[in-house]
Amino acid sequence: MKKEQFYPLGIFLAAMLGGLVRYLVSTWLPASPDFPWGTLFVNYLGIFCLIFLVKGYLVYKGTSKGLILALGTGFCGGLTTFSSLMLDTVKLLDTGRYFSLVLYLLLSIGGGLLLAYFLGRKKW
């Protein structure tokens, strides 16, 4: 069997771990109807992991494609979700928390882009 045949299994297992980390972080951070801190935190954590580990350190060290796929697509994909960002956005909109909504979108999208940009420029 070729090692490429095991890539989906590695992605699957790493995604389960990423989802578990997401759940544990959401139970660790206090829930607030005013602002979705948990989603923002795990999305920033996912950006850091994706850029630092997958785009920087692991590629630089010549890590296998399977491990990079497992961590990037699997773990980071399970850790971060666009759907949670949208769900939190709709909740803030439905409850009339417009300032929190704008702040959340600015921090999520703008902050995420800035974090990815600056981490991506760094030479690991």
Curated annotation (Swiss-Prot):
One Gene Ontology cellular component: plasma membrane
GO terms classed as biological process: cellular detoxification of fluoride; fluoride transmembrane transport
Xref: InterPro entries: FluC (IPR003691)
Keyword Transport: yes
Reactions it catalyzes: fluoride(in) = fluoride(out)
Subcellular location: Cell membrane
Residues given in the record as Na(+) binding sites: G77, T80
Keyword terms: Cell membrane, Ion channel, Ion transport, Membrane, Metal-binding, Sodium, Transmembrane, Transmembrane helix, Transport
Any one Gene Ontology molecular-function term assigned to this protein's record: metal ion binding
Transmembrane spans: 9-29, 34-54, 67-87, 99-119
Principal cellular location given in the protein's record: membrane
Membrane topology, from the record: Multi-pass membrane protein
Regulation affecting activity: Na(+) is not transported, but it plays an essential structural role and its presence is essential for fluoride channel function.
Family: Belongs to the fluoride channel Fluc/FEX (TC 1.A.43) family.
Function: Fluoride-specific ion channel. Important for reducing fluoride concentration in the cell, thus reducing its toxicity.
Record protein name field: Fluoride-specific ion channel FluC 2
